[in-house]
Amino acid sequence: MIGKLKGVIDEIAEDHAVIDVHGVGYVAFCSARTLGNLGGAGEAAILFIETYVREDMIRLYGFATQLEREWFRLLQNVQGVGAKVALAVLGTLSPSELANAIALRDIAMVSRAPGVGKKVAERIVTELKNKAPAFAGEASGTIGLKQELGAGAAPAPVADAVSALSNLGYSRDQAANAVAAALKETGEGADSAKLIRLGLKELSQ
């Protein structure tokens, strides 16, 4: 089994890269995010590999980090999610963004990925809400929110506030941290408008 490739980029295609390792070209299928960060032909590259072996083929999937590879494996535990859909999700959301979306039950965020409808997004959020932290860890903002909310799903005002702050240009982790700080001040009964206002105050400090 191949676990990692270290070589030179020979070609970048729409859904895969060819990595030359001592004269042998390996085709690795990657997410759009990973392909976009690889660089160009002739540049050095390292990919962490998930190897699929079937009777009629061997296919390699490549990832920029081991964390991304763990998410790829985890996503395919969800009914209706195969390798193609898992790559689409990882091409749309970074591991920290995906962790935040699952923690906040942000189905709309997950469904942004091509080929992921509302039902599949709901299954991803529901089936991975307890497994995801153990496999991949979480962004600090997600941890802060879980500490404030406990084990349950985030209420709609919390998810709306994080989404609104993200739409203003802040990262999902920054937004989640700010909303977690706002919750410390207001408690769980605050509406989204108040959480957004206090979140912006926190981010401006």
Curated annotation (Swiss-Prot):
Gene3D superfamilies (UniProt xref): 5' to 3' exonuclease, C-terminal subdomain, DNA helicase RuvA subunit, C-terminal domain, Nucleic acid-binding proteins
Subcellular location: Cytoplasm
UniProt GO MF annotations: ATP binding; four-way junction DNA binding; four-way junction helicase activity
Region spans: Domain I: 1-64
GO cellular component: cytoplasm; Holliday junction helicase complex; Holliday junction resolvase complex
Positions of region (Flexible linker): 144-152
Statement: the UniProt record of this protein carries the keyword Secreted: no
Function: The RuvA-RuvB-RuvC complex processes Holliday junction (HJ) DNA during genetic recombination and DNA repair, while the RuvA-RuvB complex plays an important role in the rescue of blocked DNA replication forks via replication fork reversal (RFR). RuvA specifically binds to HJ cruciform DNA, conferring on it an open structure. The RuvB hexamer acts as an ATP-dependent pump, pulling dsDNA into and through the RuvAB complex. HJ branch migration allows RuvC to scan DNA until it finds its consensus sequence, where it cleaves and resolves the cruciform DNA.
Subunit structure, interactors included: Homotetramer. Forms an RuvA(8)-RuvB(12)-Holliday junction (HJ) complex. HJ DNA is sandwiched between 2 RuvA tetramers; dsDNA enters through RuvA and exits via RuvB. An RuvB hexamer assembles on each DNA strand where it exits the tetramer. Each RuvB hexamer is contacted by two RuvA subunits (via domain III) on 2 adjacent RuvB subunits; this complex drives branch migration. In the full resolvosome a probable DNA-RuvA(4)-RuvB(12)-RuvC(2) complex forms which resolves the HJ.
Record family assignment: Belongs to the RuvA family.
Name this polypeptide is given: Holliday junction branch migration complex subunit RuvA
Designated gene of the protein: ruvA
